[in-house]
Structure formats: C-alpha cells, structure tokens
Regions:
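ATP-binding N-terminal substructure of ATP-dependent carboxylate-amine bond-forming enzymes
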Residues: 1-97
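Short acidic-hydrophobic, aromatic-tinged amphipathic segments that line or gate anion-handling sites
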Residues: 45-51, 123-127, 158
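A conserved helix-loop-beta module that forms one wall/lid of the active-site cleft
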Residues: 92-154
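Generic C-terminus detector
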Residues: 369-373, 378-427
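Active-site "cap" helix and flanking loop/linker of ATP-utilizing ligase/carboxylase catalytic domains
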Residues: 248-270, 288-359, 371-372
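Solvent-exposed alpha-helices and their adjacent loops that cap or buttress functional pockets
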Residues: 21-23, 38-39, 92, 114-116, ...
C-alpha cells in the first residue's frame, strides 16, 4: 500500500520513519517533507505544500494512496480531511469542524465548560478595557492566550500584572498575531506539572499512546520565551497508573463523547496538554488535533506496534480490535535550534557530525533542514531532534546529550536539562 504523510517537520520525519517499518507499506510519500524524510528507506518527498488541499487530493488519487496521515494543524483547520473523505480517500485526522478543538481556544474552553471537563477558570475578551479590568481583578500570575493558531507561541504566562497587561494590549490593540489575536482568552495560572497525553480516536474507541512531557520554554530550568517545544521524554512519571485512569475517565472519554454528541465525531490523534495538580487532578490546558512536536520523536522511538495498521483500524472505526505495544525503556529527545530562535534565527548554515548509519536505540529526526548542493543546511528555527532510548530517563538523557554534542553548526543551541523533573525523581 502507498501512504501519504502531510507535513515537513521533525514530527513528520518520525511518522514516516515509523510507517516505513510497516509490512503493509510499499512506499511512503511525504508532502512536502524535508531533508530527513528524503534519506529514509521507502520514503520519497513530494513537492506539494501541506496546505495545498486540491493538489494533495489529486496526488493521492493519481498515486493510489491507501492511507494519508496528517502531521501539522494548519491543513486540518482548513479541512483537508473533509476534502479527502469527499473524494473517497482514507485519511487519519479530524474534520474541519472537529479541529476547532485546536483552531479556537475560545471554542475549546466553552466546550470544556459545557461538558464539565476540568480546566482553568477563564474568560474570553475582544476589547482591551474589559480585559484589563479582569486582569486587575484577578492579579498575577495569570495566563493570556491569543485565540486561534499562533504556532505554539501565542501563549504568555505572565508573572506580573504589567506583563499580562502588555500581552493583552499587544494581542488586541496591536494584533501581534494577525487574525489569531483578535480575541484573547485570559485564564488562571495552574501550578502543577505538565504532561502530554496523546491518544488515537476512531470516533468512539480510544487507544492511548505513550505519555510524555514537553519542555516549552527556550531556556534551561524552564526560563525565557515559549517555543514550539525544546525537547520531550516518554513516559511521563507524573502520569501514574491512577492518574492515567482519571485522565481517560475525566478528560478523554467525555471529550470524545461530547464531540460526537454535538455532531463533530472526532477521528484522529487527540493530544490533551494537561496540568496534573498536586492532588492528582488532571486539568486541560489545551487540546491539539495532532501528534505533538517534539513529543512524536521519543514516542515513535518507543512504539513497537505497526503505526500503519493502527491508523487503518482507526479509519475503519475498529480501534478496539488492536492494542498498541510499547518498549518499556524511556526515550528522550533534545531539540537543537538555530541561533536566535524563537525570534529571528540564522539560516543556511552547514550541519556536520550527523550519524552516517543507523544506530540501535538512537535516532536523529530532521526538521528545519534542507539539502543544498549535496550538503545539509539549516532552514528552520528548530533544526533537528536527537532521540535516544535508555533504561532510565537519566540514561536516555545522557545518550541524547552525547548525540547532541556530535552534531554541529554555527550558533546551534539546545537545553541540557530536558527531562530534569523525571531525572530528579529517579535519583
């Protein structure tokens, strides 16, 4: 069977790498892909933008694509799944209406309230003055979010009232995030431990993927600006078996059932960004309608099941017939970023020191990398993710750090403390 993966990041490299291991897969096409996907066995890049829906549909029809997996959020929010289904094509992902869970933070907060799913207290605003009045009433620390998609950067965790007021003015009067910022959500600051809880959904049945923990801040010890994610590890020890059961019972099933009840049957990856409170209660920070990046990279390193089979079963509404199998080891991925990220960053620097052959229990997934004149050069903010398995999170971290040191280019940087919470638990 031919398979199409939509997207061009490290997440898509990991999905293509895993899909290529399936005995069901003859050929994997990635649109548009990157320099990493181009190097994988059985994988070929296709020069079509992830948001050029008509061209993607035509390609899938012309190349007998039996399954399409959507990586990023943008194509989902513009209805790529609806278009593929209308053409009678098999695609794993939520419809445009169901993807509002990620596309609109206000929709999500209102949905959670309707279905009594635990989350932070919040209010939506479109005007500056009422928003500022609410901030002054609540005080800091407080969280200000741009409604809509802002590539993971439209969230300000304000530790002072001044910071919060600046963010509101920026997003509403200055509209710093274009259209996405014309409405803001202001919500209470939750002081717990974050976890990424990703599941596969076929409309009614749910198959949990491995848990993970992402590191959003650019600096060590979680300081500095928010990014798309600087590293992740799996599993997340904060999600104990008891908390896992609570998340399924209090968050995941009510969400899947609630979406279906409202006429937006949910199929695809569903990623709940959770805050686990000190008393063990999970609260929803956000939903994403896709696999996380960089969480996908360490999670795929641990997945022992056939990803293609799982997705096909989900497309057929038969997820209850399969069970995902996981390597019991821990995995950890560290993002190597370009100088200046998450602001304006350098591009076009040659990368050296990449592993020349496959090493068991280790993998470098490429993201913002392009091939130019036979060399690999940087062309994104998050350039690649070095990923390793270990008997403990600490061992996986040390192996990943060793790998990170070998990969070089001008001005590259990375966090050396990815996984620090789990490592502290292990000591």
């Amino acid at each position: 069977m031919n398979i199409l993966i939509i997207g061009n990041g490290g997440r898509e490299h990991a999905l293509a790498w895993k899909a290529a291991q399936s005995p069901l897969a003859d050929k994997i096409f990635v649109a548009p892909g990157n320099a990493g996907t181009a190097l994988e066995q059985k994988v070929e890049n296709v020069n079509i933008s992830a948001t050029d829906v008509p061209a993607l549909v035509k390609f899938a029809q012309d190349n007998h694509i039996g399954l399409t997996i959507v990586g990023p959020e943008a194509p989902l929010v513009i209805g790529v799944v609806d278009a593929f289904r209308a053409a009678g094509l098999n695609i794993f992902g939520p419809t445009q209406a169901a993807a509002q869970l990620e596309g609109s933070k206000a929709f999500t907060k209102d949905f959670l309230a309707r279905h009594k799913i635990p989350t932070a207290e919040y209010q939506n605003f479109t005007e500056v003055e009422p928003a500022l009045a609410y901030l002054r009433e609540k005080g800091a620390p407080i969280v200000v979010k741009a409604d809509g998609l802002a590539a993971g950067k439209g969230v300000i965790v304000a530790m002072t009232l001044q910071e919060a007021e600046d963010a509101v003015r920026d997003m509403l009067s200055g509209n710093a995030f274009g259209e996405a910022g014309s409405r803001v959500v202001i919500e209470e600051f939750l002081d717990g431990e974050e976890a990424s809880f990703i599941v596969m959904v076929d409309g009614k049945n749910v198959e949990p993927m491995a848990t993970s923990q992402d590191h959003k801040r650019v600096g060590e010890k979680d300081t500095g600006l928010n990014t798309g994610g600087m590293g992740a590890y799996s599993p997340a020890p904060v999600v104990t078996p008891e908390i896992h059961a609570r998340v399924m019972r209090e968050v995941i099933y009510p969400t899947v059932n609630g979406m279906a009840a409202e006429g937006n049957v949910y199929t695809g990856f569903l990623y709940a960004g959770l805050m686990i409170m000190p008393n063990g209660q999970p609260k929803v920070i956000e939903f994403n309608c896709r696999f996380g990046d960089p969480e996908t990279q360490p999670i795929m390193l641990r997945l022992e099941s056939d990803l293609v089979e799982l997705c096909l079963k989900a497309c057929d509404g038969k997820l209850d017939e399969v069970k995902s199998q996981w390597n019991p080891k821990a995995s950890l991925g560290i993002v190597l970023a370009a100088e200046g990220y998450p602001g304006d960053y350098r591009k076009g620097d040659e990368i050296s020191g990449l592993p020349q052959s496959a090493v068991e229990n280790e993998k470098v997934f490429l993201a913002g990398v392009e091939a130019k004149a036979g060399k690999l050069v940087t062309n994104g903010g998050r350039v690649l993710c070095v990923t390793a398995l270990g008997e403990s999170v600490f061992e996986a971290q040390q192996k990943a750090l060793k790998l990170a040191e070998q990969v070089q280019w001008k001005g590259r940087f990375y966090r050396r403390d990815i996984g620090y919470r789990a490592v502290a638990r292990e000591q």
